[in-house]
Design a protein with these regions (language model features):
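Extended, charge-biased low-complexity segments
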Residues: 1-47
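Amphipathic protein-protein interaction modules
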Residues: 34-94, 98
Length: 99
């Protein structure tokens, strides 16, 4: 699959299998340019990628981004806004409020 970056995965979340988890580096906050790894949590046991943590599953990412857009009148988020919304949800288990 090659190197994946968070902005590409978030922008194309509808194209990925819903049973994939998105892993990011343990030691930093996710940004659009973050390299990610996708792990199928429905397949055979796959160990956590070393030095990475699960950000969210693709199924949850789709819901977060759909909610972000609905709360903002159907607007399409930028790469930075997608990343912010997903990181916020992953950290607080809550949708990013409208400012």
């Amino acid at each position: 699959m090659g190197t994946l970056v968070l902005s590409e995965v978030l922008a194309n979340a509808d194209k990925y299998d819903e049973y994939l988890d998105v892993y990011v580096a343990d030691d930093r906050d996710p940004v659009p340019e973050s390299e990610v790894e996708l792990v199928d949590y429905e397949g055979p046991h796959t160990p956590k990628p070393p030095g990475k943590r699960c950000l969210l599953g693709i199924d949850d990412i789709r819901i977060v981004l759909d909610t972000w857009s609905k709360w903002r009148g159907g607007r399409t988020p930028s790469d930075a806004e997608r990343c912010e919304a997903v990181a916020f949800y992953a950290k607080y288990d809550s949708y990013l409020p409208v400012e």
